[in-house]
Amino acid sequence: MLQGILETVPSDLKDPISLWFKQDRNPKTIEEVTALCKKSDWNELHKRFDSRIQFGTAGLRSQMQAGFSRMNTLVVIQASQGLATYVRQQFPDNLVAVVGHDHRFHSKEFARATAAAFLLKGFKVHYLNPDHEFVHTPLVPFAVDKLKASVGVMITASHNPKMDNGYKVYYSNGCQIIPPHDHAISDSIDANLEPWANVWDFDDVLNKALKQGKLMYSREEMLKLYLEEVSKNLVEINPLKLEVKAKPWFVYTPMHGVGFDIFSTIVKKTLCLVEGKDYLCVPEQQNPDPSFPTVGFPNPEEKGALDIGINLAEKHDIDLLVANDPDADRFSVAVKDMQSGEWRQLTGNEIGFLFAFYEYQKYKSMDKEFQHVHPLAMLNSTVSSQMIKKMAEIEGFHYEDTLTGFKWIGNRAILLEKKGYYVPFGFEEAIGYMFPAMEHDKDGISASIVFLQAYCKWKIDHNLDPLNVLENGFKKYGVFKEYNGYYVVPNPTVTKDIFDYIRNVYTPEGASYPSSIGEEIEVLYYRDLTTGYQSDTINHKPTLPVDPTSQMITVSARPSNGSENEHIRFTIRGSGTEPKLKVYIEACANEEQRASFLAKLTWNVLRREWFRPDEMNIVTKF
């Protein structure tokens, strides 16, 4: 039958499709490819077979479909074989792996296939998902740390749409992988594409390993330890002080994800908060549901994603909503403005400042000897707000920025800790918050615990809500306002063309960078991490890692007609996984209206001078 099908396949597709039929043993994906061949849907087959899904620092992520460029059981097996082989070479005396999964379609199957590959390579596997249980993503890096494993894999696509899934990798230090490991793992995957003997029989492999003591179901052990670590490291307020009102005082939504069970358990056992009495959970979004029925895009940042929760809060006269994304590694907040009566969802940068301010307050109350031995340090990604940099300058603590992603934030935090710094917090503007006392990756559950305490402390001790605290921060450190968005590009070559235009056409001949952008913006600082140039360093070498394969430029500037204390900073970069050119703009001024104006002005000037959407056929999105 297959031979007859292959006879109809175009020559440039015949080899990869033949290989697929040879290697795949999943009846559903075999039938999927067969059906596409019978329909002669060569365009779709080219999309799925012309290239192989690339393993990067975020692991793998794509739609769940048949094909070498998609997420499916065969691709997961191949990735796991390559990863297990590489890690075995790096840690031959510590063959211990952690595997977990969320509630998405096929997550359990992918996780079991992953565990089987590691078991066949001689690893002991701590499997976090007995039966039909789910775990939140932060439990995997936490377990890697506590179990001293050499690698961890979490099957999740975080807040992506329902048709997606992913394969997230943590290295032996509990952080996401960074170069050169990502490239080496990718090479190892390419060298281990042929499925190993018995790897497709993953249920049998797991059952045999369980009897031999090589497969351990470690979910309950790790959850117990996670709870203990939250209590020890993150809880500092007397739970009795959380009796803010005699009725529920906040709403929680897990966004159809895995968050509710772990959230409700943690807040009850550490903060004595009980659902129904102290808070309400959005009933329509409470249970894990991989179809995400109430939201098309299950990301708390998306417009309208929190509407159901806000409506519930309004109904019960509640003025605080906290949210996790589906795998509970991100955290978001909406608060009711008591002056206007309108609800306001805080940006990732605003929440980041509130956490940083709270952690700074805690640090200042610590023992002076501890402060002397362990100076304070906080960090965020280079596309995130510079407000904590300003706070660090004024308050006298150490601040650093990193490349985008917690793979960089987490690894840098570890290095700072080794130097003796106390690093309580790091963040990224995409609602990701890291508390290194728990793990060196973002954690939405830890963020929830810390934020609820901060909220109560400010409310009870100072009669301030988060908006008041933010306003006080603006008064002391300057008003910081962002204007972020992206352009949808038709293909990666357009992104390169735009950056080449900036470097080679817009920049005057003989200059390293443009001194101005239009008549409105005066450039003060310029960094190009693609070419390896930074304007304010010796020999103009960047302080952050250079990557010639990705496009990224950061500019600090001032408005040409502005005052000395007005400042603009923006980063433009090409997305490594999506057809997007991302733009992150932040302006600082004395007044909120002026800062917002400068941020939007910068967007418009860049649009006109650099991006030229009509000419380049790119579309604006926010």
From Swiss-Prot:
SUPFAM superfamilies: Phosphoglucomutase, C-terminal domain (SSF55957), Phosphoglucomutase, first 3 domains (SSF53738). Mg(2+) binds at residues 158, 325, 327, 329. One of its GO terms (molecular function) is magnesium ion binding. It is found in: Cytoplasm; Nucleus. Disruption phenotype: Hyperaccumulates ribose 1-phosphate and upstream purines upon glucose-induced purine nucleoside recycling. One of its GO terms (cellular component) is nucleus. One of its GO terms (biological process) is inosine catabolic process. Keywords: Carbohydrate metabolism, Cytoplasm, Glucose metabolism, Isomerase, Magnesium, Metal-binding, Nucleus, Phosphoprotein. Binds 1 Mg(2+) ion per subunit. Its EC number is 5.4.2.7. The modification Phosphoserine is found at residue 158. It comes from the Eukaryota. Major phosphoribomutase that converts ribose 1-phosphate to ribose 5-phosphate. Involved in ribose salvage via the pentose phosphate pathway. Belongs to the phosphohexose mutase family. Present with 4960 molecules/cell in log phase SD medium. This is Phosphoribomutase. The lineage of its organism: Eukaryota, Fungi, Dikarya, Ascomycota, Saccharomycotina.
